[in-house]
């Protein structure tokens, strides 16, 4: 039964992967350069979004600030359409010169994860550094408590020591040295 459940889960995962396709919506193959929307300068993210809006494209666009990466120009922003619906099969047609989605390339996260530190800003490689948790420090008042137990402290009367004569409570033995 365990093997059957594992095979069923793998089969469903393969079907879902074939239906939805991954990055890009229907009719868009992977990443799209900014130059295809009409502007090829190093203007920034705002200029990339405004050029996409001026070209009459009303679809939402995800802006990825990218440096030199394989297959793209130097210093261009990349606009990738955001897929809004997940219905039906994606009609992915590879664009000129590309082979569809290359799974190992491109940024894994376009939005920086919480608590991550940006290591290589030109390539969108985020590496998370987990800092040790800082706890709030509370200073508690320290006041002496009552003794836990009453300890017996002998007053230099070390029991019955018969070498020194008779017992005398006011006399301390073996403390001051020999008396003559």
Curated annotation (Swiss-Prot):
Q: Which residues form the signal peptide?
A: 1-21
Q: Where are the transmembrane segments?
A: none
Keyword list (alphabetical) reads: Secreted, Signal
What is a single Pfam family found in this protein's UniProt entry? Chorion_2
- Any idea where this protein resides? Secreted
A single Gene Ontology CC term: extracellular region
Q: What family does the Swiss-Prot or TrEMBL record give for this protein?
A: Belongs to the chorion protein S19 family.
Question: What's this protein's function?
Answer: Chorion membrane (egg shell) protein; plays a role in protecting the egg from the environment.
Kindly provide the name given to this protein in its UniProt entry: Chorion protein S19
Gene source species? Drosophila subobscura
Write the gene name: Cp19
């Amino acid at each position: 039964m365990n093997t059957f459940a594992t095979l069923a889960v793998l089969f469903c995962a393969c079907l879902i992967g074939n239906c939805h396709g991954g990055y890009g919506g229907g009719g868009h193959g992977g990443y799209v350069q900014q130059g295809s929307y009409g502007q090829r300068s190093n203007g920034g993210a705002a200029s990339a979004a405004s050029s996409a809006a001026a070209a009459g494209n009303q679809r939402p666009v995800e802006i990825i600030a990218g440096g030199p990466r394989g297959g793209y120009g130097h210093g261009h922003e990349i606009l990738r359409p955001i897929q809004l619906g997940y219905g039906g099969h994606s009609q992915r047609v590879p664009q000129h010169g590309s082979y569809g989605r290359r799974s190992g390339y491109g940024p894994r996260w376009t939005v920086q994860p919480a608590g991550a530190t940006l290591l290589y800003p030109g390539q969108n490689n985020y590496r998370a550094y987990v800092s040790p948790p800082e706890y709030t420090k509370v200073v508690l008042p320290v006041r002496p408590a009552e003794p836990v137990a009453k300890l017996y402290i002998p007053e230099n009367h070390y029991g019955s020591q018969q070498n020194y004569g008779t017992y005398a409570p006011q006399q301390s033995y073996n403390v001051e040295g020999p008396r003559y």
